[in-house]
Regions:
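Intrinsically disordered, low-complexity regulatory segments
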Residues: 18-21
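Short beta-strand-centered aromatic/proline hotspots
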Residues: 56-67
C-alpha cells in the first residue's frame, strides 16, 4: 500500500463528489509532469489525502487502477488550458468532519515532507505545481494522528490492509475457540469464501 497527497483546489468539489481524481497526462506545453504520472502508479487500497483551500478535507481509498480518460465534463470551464487527454483514478472519499490546516502543524509535517515533488512549500502553503505527491508512511502516520487529534473519526475499512487485518483478528478468534482443529480450518475457509 502506498500513500498520496492530492492538491486539487480547483476541482476538489467535483472530484470528491464524483469519487475520483483526474489530471491531464502532460503539462500545457506537452512536457511530462511527474505528479500527473503518479496517477498511473496508484493501486487499489492506496490512501489519498485531499488538500484544497489550505485544508486536508477528505481521505480516500483507491478503488481501481488508473485509466486514460478525457477531462470530466463536470469541470466546466475549470482548467480550460488543460489537455483533454488525461488520467483518472476512482476513489472512495470520506469527508472529514473537521478539516485541518497542515500549515498549522508544519513543525511536525515539515521535516517529513518529500524533498522532491513536495505537496507543500517550505512556508506551509500548497505547492501549485504539484498535483499528486507520493508521501511516505511516516508522513501518513503523522497525518492520521493530526486528523484524529482534530476530532475526526477515520474509517479506512475499504482498504486492503484493513480488510486483511480484520480477517487476521477473526481468524485469531476462531483459533482460540475450544473446538477440533478440523472445525477451525473449516470455519476459516468458510469466512474466506
Amino acid at each position: 500500500m502506498r500513500f498520496w497527497w492530492v492538491n486539487h483546489k480547483q476541482t476538489h468539489l467535483q472530484e470528491i463528489e464524483g469519487g475520483y481524481i483526474w489530471s491531464p497526462k502532460n503539462n500545457r506545453n506537452g512536457s511530462r509532469n511527474q505528479t500527473y504520472i503518479n496517477l498511473t502508479k496508484t493501486t487499489p487500497g492506496d490512501i489519498v489525502y485531499s488538500y484544497a483551500d489550505g485544508h486536508i478535507k477528505a481521505i480516500g481509498v483507491v478503488e481501481r487502477h488508473c485509466s486514460g480518460m478525457p477531462k470530466p465534463a463536470e469541470f466546466g470551464r475549470t482548467g480550460d488550458y488543460w489537455s483533454n487527454d488525461g488520467w483518472l483514478v476512482y476513489l472512495n472519499w470520506k469527508k472529514l468532519q473537521n478539516p485541518f490546516r497542515p500549515k498549522n502543524h508544519l513543525d511536525i509535517l515539515g521535516p517529513l515532507l518529500p524533498e522532491k515533488y513536495s505537496p507543500l512549500q517550505k512556508n506551509g502553503n500548497g505547492n501549485q505545481g504539484c498535483y499528486l505527491a507520493s508521501i511516505d508512511s511516516e508522513l501518513h502516520d503523522a497525518l492520521i494522528e493530526i486528523t484524529e487529534a482534530s476530532g475526526n473519526t477515520i474509517f479506512l475499512k475499504d482498504s486492503e490492509e484493513n480488510r486483511l487485518r480484520e480477517e487476521e483478528v477473526e481468524e485469531s478468534k476462531i483459533s482460540e475457540l475450544s473446538i477440533q482443529e478440523t472445525e477451525k480450518v473449516q470455519l476459516i475457509k468458510s469466512r474466506r469464501g
